[in-house]
Amino acid sequence: FVPNETDSMTHNLSPQTDARGVVVSECKPSSLEGYERALYQFQSNFGDATETLAATVKNDPEFVMGHVFNASAMLMMTERQYIPAIRHSIESAESLSHKSNDREKELIVAARDCLEGRWDRACVAWDRVLARYPRDAMAIQCAHLMDFFRGDAVNLRDRVGRVIQHWHESVLGYSYILGMQAFGFEECNQYDKAEEIANKALEIEPRDGWSVHALAHVMEMQGRYEEGKDLMLSREQDWAPDNGFASHNWWHLALFHIEHEDFPSAVRLYDEK
């Protein structure tokens, strides 16, 4: 973990709310700490959120959000090999419906819809959650990724836009919300706004690979290939080491090499990274 993130990971935790004040059904304090650790891993792509969540629910099998989050995180991997584990996590959460709050019940519905291929309905369910709990970082992250997978540029921008007023720098994970907003603006061709917000996110959290990714898109779309290459290389130690999203950002660097007709460098990245 990044030290400043982990130091604040247990900020304002209680048995009933997470670090952003979002309600959670009663659980062990250690379970909520595991949830926060996994959420940081999920947002930052540093570490394995599913590994953390598996250990958390093993220690507390009745932790509803642990099962819901584990299913949701695996769903975002979009790999068939995880389907049995996803189904098990969803069924575990469903079996605890008697102790689930309304938010958790809706998140279970979203996970079930997503598993069964109803991606649009899953996004509607996440939106229902966000209408009541705009600081639900897991819900906004899942919905944003699903907008990404579905190519829904308008919701990449507007879904974050509907909740951003409830976030500010003192709220844990704010930089990642800005990074999502920046990418949404870029996908809607609002490049200046995207660049401004991505840079703001990186001022708060320099290791945010998604914000670097948003900037790479801006520079690719504006033909700023040399600047884009310099961006990726100068920030390599922020976004590349031990980051699960690094392979995609390496691909963006390869694109900048290709734009310069530096094909050997692009091929070398393909072979080595």
Predicted features, each with a name:
Residues 30, 62-66, 102, 136-137, ...:
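Residue-level recognition of tetratricopeptide repeat
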Residues 14-33, 93-104, 169, 173:
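TPR-adjacent "capping" and linker segments in tetratricopeptide-repeat scaffold/adaptor proteins
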Residues 52-54, 83-96, 120-130, 154-167, ...:
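Alpha-helical repeat scaffolds
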Residues 10-11, 32, 37-54, 58-62, ...:
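Inter-helical turn/loop elements of alpha-helical hairpins
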Residues 161-260:
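Internal metal/ion-chelating core segments
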